[in-house]
Every structure is written in structure tokens, then in C-alpha cells.
Amino acid sequence: MANVESFDLDHTKVRAPYVRLAGVKTTPRGDSISKYDLRLLQPNQGAIDPAAIHTLEHLLAGYLRDHLQDVVDVSPMGCRTGMYMAVIGTPDEEGVLKAFEAALQDTAAHDRPIPGVSELECGNFRDHDLHAARQHAREALAQGLKVQQTVLLQR
């Protein structure tokens, strides 16, 4: 099986909430695509409810694009402790941190209908929790986001 970057991360050494550059790939044409780990909860000490992380996905997909150029995708982690974000290019981690903070502030203040929540727009449109999503955003902001360096497992 191919190596998976997140399986080499020592999840006991990172301290959420944080932004971490998880990797950079170069396309055959020479473009860079950067993947960021946008962690909200400490690994193995909790998980975001599926309805809340689904709502965070919808909100952060838009709000991160409002604050950072060239966002390709924002997707929830399977462990439900945060999101992955793919971006064209190699924005610096401090810039990504500022964009993530701004997007979380927007999420915490969101008081309108959740975007993309209809049977036509979403594959599970009934599974959302705006209140819980806003609470996770507020909690991460209250704890203070930081840039986290990658800590590899010692094997």
C-alpha cells in the first residue's frame, strides 16, 4: 500500500487547534498543490458529531474561499477532528492561519440558512447542525489557533 502522510504523523505530539502544512504535490505541469490540516479538536480526545462536521464543511468551504485564494477543496477528516484543505500554490502557514481564523469567525457568527442544503445540492441534506458547528468554531477560536509543525512518528 502507498504511504499515507497522516499515518506518519505522531497524533500524540500535536496540540489542537492548529493549521499544519501536511504536504505539497507537484503536478506534471509544474504546479504545486498544498494540503493543509485544519485541526479543531485534539486527536483521540473527542470527535465532532457527523451533523456538525457536515455543516462545518458547507460553511468553511465558502468562508475559506472568501479569505484565501485558489482553494481547491475543503473536506472533513474521517476521524472527525478537523478538515483538510487543498490549495493551488504554496501559501504560507501564517496566511492560512489568518484565513482559517477569519473563516471560523464567520462560521461562529453565521445566522442564515446553511448554504447548499437541499436535496438537489447535497447528498445528505437532512444531516446538519448549525448550532453545534458554530459552537465548535467558537471553542477553537477561544483556545487560540497556532501553526503546528509536523511531528513524525519515531519508527
UniProtKB/Swiss-Prot annotation:
Keywords, comma-separated and alphabetical: Autoinducer synthesis, Iron, Lyase, Metal-binding, Quorum sensing
Keyword Metal-binding among UniProt keywords: yes
E.C. code: 4.4.1.21
Entry coiled-coil feature ranges: none
Cofactor: Fe cation
Cofactor note: Binds 1 Fe cation per subunit.
NCBIfam families, per the entry: PRK02260.2-4
Protein name, entry field: S-ribosylhomocysteine lyase
